[in-house]
């Protein structure tokens, strides 16, 4: 889930759903693809992209794994203690007045997942996907 913050010269505030939507639809979308069903009252859910990087237990190298054929009915399982790197399906084009922070949804935290705290995107961060670090 991404929380988007509006920066004015004196204040910072969380964007409401209608503000996120207005900035994600149109000619210069802040997040693309924008899926309306993923919009929450003050945040936007993001989707893991088709590839993750998994640590090889034999030599600690990262191995690219294609998870694109996995679904809710056929999930790719993150084993206890396992750590993976992934990236969002979404590409971000934040204007100079908006920053974003990735936080784990509480339902995933209750399932035992954790993520590193590197999920910050500065104002003006554009043309990139967000790297996410997940651990079970």
Spans of model-derived segments:
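Non-catalytic terminal segments and appended small domains
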Residues: 1-136
